[in-house]
Amino acid sequence: MTVGAGGKTSADADPLMLVRAIADADRRAAHALNLVPSENRISPLASLPLASDFYNRYFFNTDGDPLFWEFRGGEDIAHIEALGAAALRRMASARYCNVRPISGMSAMILTVAALSPPGSTVVSVDQNSGGHYATPALLGRLGRRSRLLNCKDGEVDESELAEVLAPGDVALVYVDVQNCVRVPDFRRMSDVIREVSPGTRLYVDASHYLGLVLGGLLANPLDCGADAFGGSTHKSFPGPHKGVIFTNAEDVDESLRSAQFDLVSSHHFAETLALSLAALEVEDRMGDYARATNDNARRLAGALADAGFRVYGDSATGYTDTHQVWVELDGVAAAYALSNRLAEGGIRVNLQSSMPGMSGVHLRLGSNEVTFEGAGPQAIEELAGALVTARERALGPRTVHEIRGRFGAPFYTDPEKLKVEAGL
């Protein structure tokens, strides 16, 4: 018997026992209600490749060259990646779609490397304004200089942007707003860039609200003058953990393809197949899903505000334009007591301590996953009621079951129909 980190012995690491623990946790997860805005639940259809042999395989022959099958196994299904990319292009109204990134951060690295030379300046959004925490440090590691922009309630200060651009050394404006109930006006940003520094590229990291863009609820950055946009595919878009980048510019696409050769080896074939199936499955439902997601977010925000929670945002405009709802809480102890009661009752929430315009520990909630599973107005009202209850006491043992009983049809293929029609 050996003793490892944390005092664990080899007896504690029996693989069968560990698998049982995973299975038990997975069963609980299947019934839980997840209100974390940076997560979503992949559909049964899209999840199939993740349990297939393709999870073990490389796939490099993106052009389908019959003389380039150095790694075998993908010949018969290579077209699925192409079909999925085409569906994504249609949803984004984009000429080009790059599905090589393996995550949102991978997409960020690829974009920065492709669209800015070493030593140049890249402008991003300050974390205190909702920007991604890692962007400035990542830029430094890649040999770029970082400049930060303020963004208040979704509004970028145009005079500040013009001032940052004026020296002429900015290669890329990388709009990385992740914490947002309002989305910046990309058209106005593009206009400033084209006037002050026409050679500067504009990229929108839409990781959090990608599904709302693809569903037509929020403005398409390409239509607003951005050179490219993209991000992760597992937040408001119900896909696997992957990344995607869209552009209409041939030179941008070529730069991305050139950079990916060095920065992305395996693009994780099973996950790419899963992304393709997710895109093909939701393409015709994406508009309805995006609208329902925002409707549910606004309904949740309003119900919580009516119950006395301090909800961030303007009640006159529905508190949020995205899937996110922010709620201020009364100190760390109260925040974790609420989160623990909810988790024990099967409702998962996201605590944050660095949200723009808010102090202390607070809730960052998302309507995206429960909407994908079929939550409608009544279910959302009862979810809000569960949060109200959890401020004072534990939830009842059937609370989640009863809320799920209010769900309508999900935005994905019925699993039983899938088994019959696919012969599974």
Swiss-Prot record:
Its cofactor is pyridoxal 5'-phosphate. Pathway: Antibiotic biosynthesis. Optimum pH is 7.5. GO terms for cellular component: cytoplasm. GO terms for molecular function: glycine hydroxymethyltransferase activity; pyridoxal phosphate binding. Changing K235A: Loss of activity. Cannot bind pyridoxal phosphate. It catalyses: uridine-5'-aldehyde + L-threonine = (5'S,6'S)-C-glycyluridine + acetaldehyde. Catalyzes the condensation of L-threonine and uridine-5'-aldehyde to form 5'-C-glycyluridine (GlyU). Forms (5'S,6'S)-GlyU. Has no activity with alternative amino acids, such as glycine or serine. This is L-threonine:uridine-5'-aldehyde transaldolase. Belongs to the SHMT family. The modification N6-(pyridoxal phosphate)lysine is found at K235. It is an enzyme of class 2 (transferase). Keywords: Antibiotic biosynthesis, Pyridoxal phosphate, Transferase. Pfam families: SHMT. It comes from Streptomyces sp.
